[in-house]
From Swiss-Prot:
Reactions it catalyzes: chloride(in) = chloride(out)
Ranges annotated as spanning the membrane: 65-85, 302-318
Positions where Phosphotyrosine occurs in the chain: 10
Pfam families membership: TMEM206
Name this polypeptide is given: Proton-activated chloride channel
UniProt membrane topology term: Multi-pass membrane protein
Record keywords: Cell membrane, Chloride, Chloride channel, Glycoprotein, Ion channel, Ion transport, Membrane, Phosphoprotein, Transmembrane, Transmembrane helix, Transport
Gene: Pacc1
Glycan-bearing residues: 155, 162
Length: 350
């Protein structure tokens, strides 16, 4: 659009310049013929000469004013182009500094079984079993039951306190999210000197990686350093629904995070009074949905769009400067021709 306007302005200027040149040449020829016809002794009328001079002066003034307006318009366009260049560069730098967070979801049929690390302390694992959709009623709460879960005990040094030993019970978590697989565990704590009873647990992304690791103690130290620990209280059934979030870091590494939704239901203890001194813990782990959330930072700044805008702005600056230069030259040329015509008219009168 800018090129079309500039080409049109160039054509108008060239046509006006040719018209002015033709008019001046025709006027020169008419003056010469008039002088030849009147003879050397005849002087043209002062009034006619003054009138023609004033008309030519008015036309020249109008053309000069029009040229000045054109120059001002194109100077304004140059200022807009400069502002556009500055704004484009500023926006591009801001987009580079502040990337936008992109969140996507990937559906899976089954998860890689997570690892659940329990820190029961003096509590004892009574039962551990995988169920689907529903949990059957408790047959004998507080008594040892079935253990069809894959478990392993491991002792390692606390990653932050070198003189503290951690004793963890690692349990394989659920996999079949479409079948609503869940893991139900029951613990019993016979005696406790504490005012509040709770068991800590930790979730990490892959039980298989733990089993294949040659340094399981170091693996658990790294997990405890990277993941947060949670608690579930005695006397309740805590239902934990897990969801997986993968975040892509700036250096290309992928960090895994578990998000949990917990619901707590009070356990109605119907055991004999002699057995109620032992505290019971119930916990259920289940996947919330079959969608893995992926989070990454993306840069919305497109370098090709920025380059195209800059090229267009610089082209507009160049064309505007060229047109302004041509307009100034045209004004100077018109001014010289006007002064020349005025001098010739003065000579004729004298």
């Amino acid at each position: 659009m800018i090129r079309q306007e500039l080409s049109t302005s160039y054509q108008e200027l060239s046509e006006e310049l040719e018209q002015v040149v033709e008019n001046s040449e025709q006027a020169d020829e008419r003056d010469k013929e008039l002088v030849q016809v009147q003879g050397p002794g005849v002087v043209p009328g002062v009034d006619n000469e003054s009138a023609s001079s004033s008309i030519r002066f008015s036309k020249a003034c109008l053309k000069n004013v029009f040229s000045v307006l054109l120059i001002l318009i194109y100077l304004l366009l140059m200022a807009v182009a400069v502002f556009l260049v500055y704004q484009t560069i500023t926006d591009f730098r801001e987009k580079l500094k502040h990337p936008v967070m992109s969140v996507s979801y990937k559906e899976v049929d089954r998860y890689d079984a997570p690892g659940i690390a329990f820190y029961p302390g003096q509590a004892q694992l009574l039962s551990c079993k995988h169920h689907y959709e529903v949990i059957p009623p408790l047959a004998s709460p507080g008594q040892p039951g079935d253990r069809n879960c894959t478990t392993q005990r491991i002792n390692y040094t606390h990653p932050f306190f070198n003189h503290t030993m951690q004793s963890a019970l690692i349990v394989q978590g659920p996999q079949e999210v479409k079948k609503r697989e869940l893991v139900f565990l029951q613990f019993r704590l016979n005696q406790s000197n504490e005012d509040f009873s709770a068991i800590d647990y930790l979730l990490f992304s892959s039980f298989r990686e733990f089993m294949q690791s040659p340094d399981k103690a170091g693996f658990m130290q790294a997990c405890e350093s990277a993941y947060s620990s949670w608690k579930f209280s005695g006397g309740f059934r805590t239902w934990v629904k897990m969801s997986l979030v993968k975040t892509k870091e700036e250096d290309g590494r992928e960090a895994v995070e578990f998000r949990q939704e917990t619901s707590v239901v009070n356990y109605i203890d119907q055991r004999p009074a002699a057995e109620r001194s032992a505290q019971l813990f119930f916990v259920v782990f289940e996947w919330k949905d079959p969608f893995i959330q992926k989070v990454q930072d993306i840069i919305t700044a497109n370098p090709w769009n920025t380059i195209a805008l800059l090229c267009g702005a610089f082209l507009a600056l160049f064309k505007a400067a060229e047109f302004a230069k041509l307009s100034v030259k045209w004004m100077i040329k018109i001014r010289k021709r006007y002064l020349k015509r005025r001098g010739q008219a003065t000579n004729h009168i004298s």
